[in-house]
């Protein structure tokens, strides 16, 4: 993955995928954890599990959230590969505690207003009706996680994700630069003029 590896986390609708895509556009190495690493597993053991039959849509939504894990062996493998200067893992994982200490930093995207999150979820589901966040039970779960901050790293740098996307990414890169004492290296940095 990279010599320096960072996790970008946050509640659904805070902009993790948008940030990941903008970082990629700027030439950074990005791993979309929710696409490339996720599986349904036992939150305690990590063993893959089959989804049971649920009594209600709410039970199904909660179960899926609680059992959304990232493959730890894959995460460790990517972190051990130092062929990139900087890499970002973006997405939500219920087992981040199993690998968070291997990372150089964590950024937590935050949106204070739940209505903004609902609007973003509605926009996302309008583009892809199968995406998470369109059902009332999913919005209820998002509201709970937003309120309690459960399943969100508590040790990360909070990034105000109500800013325009480019400002959010600039702020993340500013923190990376400060931590490294230099400009984050990106193949497209000179072309885009972004720092």
Model-predicted segments: where are they?
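The Walker A (P-loop) glycine that initiates the GxxxxGKT/S ATP-binding motif of P-loop NTPases
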Residues: 10
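Small-molecule kinase domains that catalyze NTP-dependent phosphoryl transfer to phosphate-bearing small molecules
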Residues: 96, 123-174, 178-195
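Conserved phosphate-donor/acceptor-positioning beta-strand/loop module used by diverse small-molecule
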Residues: 102-124
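Conserved glycine(s) of the Walker
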Residues: 15
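Conserved Walker
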Residues: 18
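Conserved substrate/cofactor phosphate-moiety recognition/catalytic segment
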Residues: 21-73
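Glycine-rich phosphate-binding loop used to anchor ATP phosphates in small-molecule kinases
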Residues: 59-103, 110-111
């Amino acid at each position: 993955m990279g010599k320096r590896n960072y996790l970008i986390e946050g509640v659904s609708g805070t902009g993790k995928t948008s940030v990941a895509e903008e970082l990629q556009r700027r030439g950074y190495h990005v791993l979309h954890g929710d696409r490339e690493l996720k599986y349904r597993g036992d939150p305690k053991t990590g063993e893959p599990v089959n989804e049971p039959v649920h009594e209600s849509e709410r039970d199904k939504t909660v179960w899926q959230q609680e059992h959304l894990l990232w493959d730890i062996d894959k995460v460790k493998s990517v972190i051990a590969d130092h062929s990139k200067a900087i890499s970002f893992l973006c997405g939500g994982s219920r087992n981040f505690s199993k690998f968070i200490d291997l990372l150089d930093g964590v950024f937590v995207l935050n949106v204070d207003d739940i209505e903004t999150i609902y609007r973003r979820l509605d926009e996302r589901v309008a583009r892809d009706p199968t995406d998470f966040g369109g059902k009332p039970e999913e919005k209820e779960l998002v509201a709970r996680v937003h309120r309690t901050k459960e399943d969100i790293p508590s040790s990360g740098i909070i990034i105000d994700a109500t800013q325009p996307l480019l400002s959010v990414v600039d702020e993340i890169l500013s923190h990376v630069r400060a931590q490294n004492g230099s400009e984050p290296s990106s193949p497209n940095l000179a072309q885009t003029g972004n720092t």
